[in-house]
Amino acid sequence: MKSEIKKNDMVKVIAGDDKGKVAKVLAVLPKTSQVVVEGCKVVKKAIKPTDDNPKGGFIKKEKPMHISNVKKA
């Protein structure tokens, strides 16, 4: 599906928990028709302990949302 939304565009979320937010697009996933929007649909992800991070823990990360849930601002 061809989309006018590109990386670094400012978009407004029109559906979902973050409805009304205006933020920047971090990534566009054309195969799945999804976008990753900065600060929207944030989830806590568990990180296993590694050599770099011996304690492990949690990080907050944006999940992709369907492109129909955003429009250019």
From Swiss-Prot:
Identify the Gene3D superfamilies for this entry: 2.30.30.30
Top-rank taxon of the source lineage equals Bacteria
Mark out the compositionally biased spans (Basic and acidic residues).
Answer: 53-65
For region Disordered, the annotated ranges are 53-73
| Keywords noted in UniProt | Ribonucleoprotein, Ribosomal protein, RNA-binding, rRNA-binding
- Biological processes annotated in GO: translation
NCBIfam families, alphabetized? rplX_bact
What is the protein's known function? One of two assembly initiator proteins, it binds directly to the 5'-end of the 23S rRNA, where it nucleates assembly of the 50S subunit. One of the proteins that surrounds the polypeptide exit tunnel on the outside of the subunit.
Assembly description? Part of the 50S ribosomal subunit.
By what name is this protein known? Large ribosomal subunit protein uL24
Originating organism: Helicobacter pylori (strain J99 / ATCC 700824)
